[in-house]
A protein has these predicted regions:
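Serine-hydrolase catalytic core recognition
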Residues: 198-199, 260-261, 269, 275, ...
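A short helix->beta-strand "capping" segment at the edge of beta-propeller domains
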Residues: 33-58, 108-110, 238-246
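Short loop/turn segments that connect beta-strands within beta-propeller blades
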Residues: 83-86, 141-144, 235-238, 290-294, ...
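A conserved hydrophobic secondary-structure block that centers on an alpha-helix together
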Residues: 109-156, 250-253, 262
Length: 709
């Protein structure tokens, strides 16, 4: 059995948070050198003050009494706001909580370990429990006796049931591989055949007297994937039926059903439904299967020949469980459609030249859909819309000058709106469902912010490398900012396709405390940033490491006209995809970037998993030019600035082989660089104090020279 690695970051996007926000903890050691460096005292003085500088006007109000009132807390005191009288009254304090609640099976309500699945699943009526053990599926009945549902799962034959391959958990968000029917009469489960998949051997426990090895069937770009099947077990007959989950032979790349995921039952338990794609992931079929016979039908099909399809679109059932709302990018922008379960399109609910961004509520009694969309003054400002379930009378209900987050009342008569922009802090308001203002409930208090002399974050625009796509950046200034001086710049990055970014939604935040070291912090977007439509994302298809880096380079160039920016002192940092972006920016643009800290980066996409990599790059055999252009090793001879590399020795996501090949290439090219290693650490980032030492040393105390543009 493979040894599971603990202590890993729970999700890829979590690794991007420090990079996106630019917030670091105070020094926790690092030989205390940071204490002696320029800016340290100012940072220590301002760090906590900045993070508490604004009393937010976001009440985080909760609807009660079916929409007649709101409850919220201000300064530790609870209040009830009466919608009819428009008056607030203080409520008694809640009694202190004692003890913790009982956790449920299979993780106590938490997520399974990264890339893994829950090992148990209890039937809805709580009579039975299906569980994964020793590569087989077991069933425990009401008498407590366990019997095997499968028996041929084995490590020797590389067959397993009731669990999934690592790549399915990591890239397709499969946190379970066992699915009970709502009526508790049947249970569906995965079967994985990993025989064709090469193993990766990861050395663990390297700080101990003797190390151990974790063996994982890990398919890398271009190599065979595991073969997946789904079976349905009938509790009464104790027999399993194999579903016809694919259109052809499992090893054929063109077969739709190469990947099978997002498995669930219809509400009436009449069919098991799932999504399936071809290996290239430019065709996705929403599929329904009869659990008694295993026969399957395609409910609807999505194709996007110039890129990849969204592999898990929004799907919301209506109350009759026969109609559902479906999100599709088929027009080039994400829109909503109403279907019946036979696959018949009833109507397009929206047809916008901008992205829909989430369903708030389906009000069938009123015959309307409330949803969010990127229809503000720019794509980063989400708005509340209402449209009839017949696709008519679409209306925006919020002010397009702001970004909105809304909570609709249970009775559908009002909604709470939290409105903000990058330079206007949150205000909470009560509006009726026509969008008419009823009352302003709270405004942010900026008194402390102003007393501290803090500067609001500035938004700027620049053109992408194509010369026409409008992109946005955010600039964070130190409280001591003097426009007559020149400042070094730090650029926190993530940069992956459609990944989380603070330039994807325009919200208010205080300046990054890191600025107090004497830096200006700049966040950049690219055509990989979500929210601009599918055709914009198409620009990066088969070109990871090229287009998004070119766009960020244009953002750095756009700052050159500002006299207080020192273009010879620009640093970039990030983790995971952000680590890849950091290394590539330094290597590809030595005339723009003087220093980079790259944590846990992919360095060549041939070394990463099939599902993620091939979605954007296809296979190396048919896109050699793209893989070569996206490899950090291609550019090592261009290294001029300072490079800090970090990796965890127990990283089972982005394997240490990525870093080893980059280090080897740098050494062969005669290049100098620094390394930091996380012994027995998984997919993680560098010690933040050490990273700040690196940037202060190389951009302030002895700045690396670059040829300015």
């Amino acid at each position: 059995m493979s040894k599971r690695i603990t202590g890993r970051v729970p999700a890829r996007l979590a690794l991007a948070l420090v990079a996106i926000l630019g917030v670091f903890p105070a020094s926790s050691g690092a030989q205390d050198r940071l204490r002696t460096m320029p800016g340290y005292d100012q940072y220590q003085k301002m760090n906590t003050l900045i993070q508490s500088a604004v009393r937010s006007g976001d009440l985080r109000a909760t609807w009660v009494e079916n929409g007649k009132a709101l409850e919220y807390t201000i300064d530790g005191k609870r209040y009830r706001y009466d919608v009819a009288t428009r008056k607030a009254s203080e409520l008694p304090a809640l009694p202190p909580q004692t003890g913790g609640g009982r956790g449920g099976r299979g993780g106590g309500g938490g997520a399974p370990e990264r890339g893994r699945q829950f090992a148990q699943a209890q039937s809805p009526d709580k009579t039975f429990e299906a569980s994964y053990r020793d590569r087989n599926l077991w069933m425990k009945g009401p008498d407590g006796v366990e019997t095997p549902i499968t028996t041929d799962g084995s490590e020797k034959d590389r067959i397993k049931y009731g669990t999934a391959s690592w790549v399915y958990g990591e890239e397709l968000d499969q946190t379970t591989a066992i699915w009970w029917a709502p009526n508790s009469r049947k249970v569906a489960y995965y079967r994985f055949d990993e025989k064709p998949v090469p193993d990766y051997f990861l050395q663990l426990d390297q700080t101990k007297l003797y190390s151990t090895v974790d063996t994982e069937a890990y398919p890398k770009a271009g190599v065979p994937n595991p073969v997946v099947d789904i079976f349905v077990y009938d509790v009464a007959s104790k027999q399993s039926v194999k579903l016809d989950v694919r259109t052809g032979k499992p090893f054929e790349n063109s077969v739709v059903g190469h990947y099978v995921y997002n498995v669930r039952w219809t509400p009436d338990a009449s069919e098991l439904i799932f999504n399936r794609t071809n290996r290239r992931q430019n065709i996705m079929e929403f599929t329904a299967c009869k659990p008694d016979t295993g026969t399957c039908r395609v409910v609807l099909r999505e194709e996007w020949p110039t890129g990849w399809v969204e592999n898990n679109p929004t799907m919301v059932y209506l109350k009759d469980n026969k109609r559902f709302i479906w999100a599709s990018e088929r027009t080039g922008f994400n829109n909503y459609y109403l279907y019946d379960i036979s696959g018949k399109l009833i109507t397009a609910l929206t047809n916008h030249p901008f992205e829909v961004a989430g369903i708030i509520r389906v009000d069938e009694a009123a015959g309307v859909l409330y949803y969010m969309a990127r229809s503000g003054d720019n794509y980063m400002k989400t708005q509340l819309h209402r449209v009839g379930l017949d696709g008519k009378n679409d209306r925006r209900l919020t002010d397009p000058a702001f970004t909105h987050a809304v909570t609709l009342a249970p009775d559908g008569k009002h909604f709470v709106d939290v409105a903000q922009t990058h330079d206007q802090p949150p205000t909470t308001r009560l509006l009726d469902v026509t969008g008419k203002l009823v009352a302003e409930l709270a405004k942010s208090d900026m008194t402390k912010f102003e007393q501290l002399g803090l500067k609001k974050i500035e938004m700027f625009t620049y053109n992408a490398a194509d010369g026409k796509t409008k992109l946005h950046g955010m600039i964070s200034y130190p409280s001591t900012f003097d426009p007559s001086k020149k400042y070094p710049v730090l650029v926190p990055v993530y940069g992956g396709p459609a990944s989380a970014s603070n330039t994807a939604r325009e919200t208010f935040s205080v300046p990054s405390p890191t600025t107090e070291y004497g830096f200006i912090i700049v966040n950049l977007s690219s055509r990989a940033t979500p929210g601009m439509g599918k055709r914009t994302l198409d620009a990066i298809y088969e070109k990871l490491g090229q287009v998004e880096m070119d766009d960020m380079a244009e953002g750095i160039k756009a700052l050159s006209s500002r006299l207080y920016i020192d273009p010879s002192r620009v640093g970039v940092y990030g983790t995971s995809y952000g680590g890849y972006t950091s290394a590539m920016m330094l290597l590809r643009f030595p005339e723009l970037v003087a220093a980079a800290s790259a944590s846990s980066p992919v360095t060549d996409w041939r070394h990463y998993d099939t599902i993620y990599t091939e979605r954007y790059m296809w296979i190396p055999e048919e896109n050699k030019e793209g893989y070569d252009a996206g490899s950090a090793m291609t550019y090592v001879a261009k290294l001029k600035g300072r490079l800090m590399l970090y990796w965890g020795t127990a990283d089972n996501n982005v394997h240490p082989s990525n870093m080893m090949q980059l280090i080897q290439a740098l050494q062969r090219a005669g290049k100098s660089f620094e390394t930091q290693v996380g012994p027995d650490q998984g997919h993680s980032g560098i010690n933040q104090a050490r990273m700040m030492e690196f940037f202060i040393e190389n951009l302030v105390m002895r700045p690396a020279a670059v040829t300015t543009f």
